[in-house]
């Protein structure tokens, strides 16, 4: 007969649940767990190879942090016995062996600690894979990803050299990669049509200037004529009888080296009958020398800061004018060309006129283009045999070596001049290419470069001359990787495009933020003196209205 056994009921008046542990479960260890944990945590060998860190600990849990199931090695005191503690001399092999054993013990201890806190241990092969993945990821981001996006954010949109109006029509567009492929070899030897002006001789004492014997840059008040093509009386006279394309060396150098430019610039083109005239706008910034234009991080200060792009350009132009005259033997004997300076009036003092000579040269480009260019020399130099060499004098200026990956000229110019010129070529590639093209067009034997730095980084009004350097234009062109064939190819391409246009006025404009130049057709009266007078009158009327 079945017998009913009354169960033992535990009464817990002060709480909920049993108040004592049953006998069969008294010595059994227990560790809290979660029924929501994923299965497979024990045998997860793939966790070390996860590329996304979000899935590295997908089997981890907030439970299981206890040490109920952890194994701890306890020493058995029953086996304790006294031993001889006398120290014996150990061999080098034994010392190294103990050192490796201690390192292995520390590694095992760290591994046990990581297991205790559910940290994932990567095997040796997985560690190497992870390091290789991180290295490749950083390399990729440095070359293509993060760095490029950061540069795009840091670059501010640049302003155009002239405001493009709504009634201007785009006639042609040329991108720089296309222009860089141009080549033209059918260029005849230049012929001198007329030479004007007078040049002062170069003072060779400036070749001995070093950073230890620096020389202050003086402010020399002389008149520099920057007359555009159509205002030149000699070109007007020559245009009646010969030539069908006319320009100045500065304008042609801008076009021939345009693929290196970053800032915006513009050139006015006038098609009169079968003739082309390349001009610059009046009161434009065309003659200002840019500073660090092609650097990775060009100057971006705004407002009245002396390190803003425009103020730096004005400072560089000021330095270039003063150095080109200070390094000459001013007030002494001059080298006179057959004709006088066409821009100097009879009542003007010759000592107030800058040392400059104009050489009007003629090139034959193929069978249909007769190019006449006004080129310039800045000085003359006597050689060892008493011969005369014409030179172009230009100036590189240091404004702050901490910017644009610059090099401190006072420390490197004498010992590592190659590093200085390499940095300048990187930061001012377009400016150096323009100067080289001007020297090649003029036929100058040498290109003199002066190194001028600020007296103090924060003072843009005082400067010192730290040294000079001399180059032959052809050799310097190869050093700066300037292809003369490509330069003539770009010029021939621009001339052919303009020759296909109808008679009128056009504008060649470099896009301020893209590697593109465009040709715009301009309405009648654009950039004329009458239009400028009307704009000035409108500005004066607006100022009077504001005052009232």
Curated annotation (Swiss-Prot):
Protein name: Eukaryotic translation initiation factor 3 subunit D
Keyword set includes Acetylation: yes
Organism classification: Eukaryota, Metazoa, Chordata, Craniata, Vertebrata
GO cellular component, one term: eukaryotic 48S preinitiation complex
Residues the record lists as N6-acetyllysine modifications: 53
Biological processes per GO annotation: cap-dependent translational initiation; formation of cytoplasmic translation initiation complex; translational initiation
Residue span of region RNA gate: 285-299
Region (Disordered), start-end ranges: 523-548
The keyword Protein transport is assigned to this record: no
Keywords attached to this entry: Acetylation, Cytoplasm, Initiation factor, Phosphoprotein, Protein biosynthesis, RNA-binding
Entry domain remark: The RNA gate region regulates mRNA cap recognition to prevent promiscuous mRNA-binding before assembly of eif3d into the full eukaryotic translation initiation factor 3 (eIF-3) complex.
Record function comment: mRNA cap-binding component of the eukaryotic translation initiation factor 3 (eIF-3) complex, a complex required for several steps in the initiation of protein synthesis of a specialized repertoire of mRNAs. The eIF-3 complex associates with the 40S ribosome and facilitates the recruitment of eIF-1, eIF-1A, eIF-2:GTP:methionyl-tRNAi and eIF-5 to form the 43S pre-initiation complex (43S PIC). The eIF-3 complex stimulates mRNA recruitment to the 43S PIC and scanning of the mRNA for AUG recognition.
InterPro entries in UniProt: eIF3d
Assembly, per entry: Component of the eukaryotic translation initiation factor 3 (eIF-3) complex, which is composed of 13 subunits: EIF3A, EIF3B, EIF3C, EIF3D, EIF3E, EIF3F, EIF3G, EIF3H, EIF3I, EIF3J, EIF3K, EIF3L and EIF3M. The eIF-3 complex appears to include 3 stable modules: module A is composed of EIF3A, EIF3B, EIF3G and EIF3I; module B is composed of EIF3F, EIF3H, and EIF3M; and module C is composed of EIF3C, EIF3D, EIF3E, EIF3K and EIF3L. EIF3C of module C binds EIF3B of module A and EIF3H of module B, thereby linking the three modules. EIF3J is a labile subunit that binds to the eIF-3 complex via EIF3B.
Compositionally biased residues, Acidic residues: 529-548
Organism: Macaca fascicularis
Molecular-function GO term, any one: mRNA cap binding
PTM sites of type Phosphoserine: 161, 528-529
UniProt record similarity statement: Belongs to the eIF-3 subunit D family.
Location in the cell: Cytoplasm
